[in-house]
Amino acid sequence: MAAVPDTSDMMTYCSGNENDLFFEEDGPKQMKGSFQDLDLSSMGDGGIQLQFSHHLYNKTFKHAMSIIVAVEKLKKIPVPCSQAFQDDDLRSLFSVIFEEEPIICDNWDEGYVCDAAMHSVNCRLRDIYHKSLVLSGACELQAVHLNGENTNQQVVFCMSFVQGEEETDKIPVALGLKEKNLYLSCGMKDGKPTLQLETVDPNTYPKRKMEKRFVFNKMEIKGNVEFESAMYPNWYISTSQAEKSPVFLGNTRGGRDITDFIMEITSA
């Protein structure tokens, strides 16, 4: 069995410049060839110069070990790149490593939904005939003409921008009465969609994801606004031509029912 050379023998054999390893039939000799002779780029001080011999017989274990050391050093030599590493190269690498898969959410527990910061504005609404909306009794809105000293009866809405179905020209909002636990909502009564004021828990409302009965799609038309029920499409917050009539949910646009409102943003 061949004896394994001692580490010190190997270090002695590779003494001097450890990168200068030459291989011939009889062992290390003077340099007769290099990578520079092969018209390769200069590798600086870390270059390894080799002399290749076609005589493969009579090689010792030391020769084999030296070749292994040389090959391992060659692996560590940086290869010049014709251009800098680009973002596209990184994307190509990621596409090989990772496989893109769609994320499908069939349903989720609303108890774990974290509401984003609510955006809301205070506003007053009048129909295009300048009737203001006032609170009559405990839970009814009426449209009346106000002037002078009674203008302070006009209701101030806190209009919150909420989550709704994706629409390009419709903005989902909820309309609550400022400083009151009342919100406009839609329900069914005697087989017909109706508008009502609903009392809510102030510790829970408003919230980003409101129940659909509270949601209205706000649309701007020629400087005015319309509010369409999200629960009952094509039904709108409406007023009547008559004075002191209740505000209701109607499905007639451009007729006797008034669906266009003037919105005034206020800080009050």
Swiss-Prot record:
Alphabetical list of Gene3D superfamilies matching this protein: 2.80.10.50
Gene: IL1B
Pro-sequence residue ranges: 1-115
GO molecular function, one term: integrin binding
One of the record's GO cellular component terms: cytosol
Subcellular location: Cytoplasm, Cytosol; Secreted; Lysosome; Secreted, Extracellular exosome
Pfam families per record: IL1 (PF00340), IL1_propep (PF02394)
Protein's UniProt name: Interleukin-1 beta
An annotated GO BP: positive regulation of T-helper 1 cell cytokine production
Keyword line: Cytokine, Cytoplasm, Inflammatory response, Lysosome, Mitogen, Pyrogen, Secreted
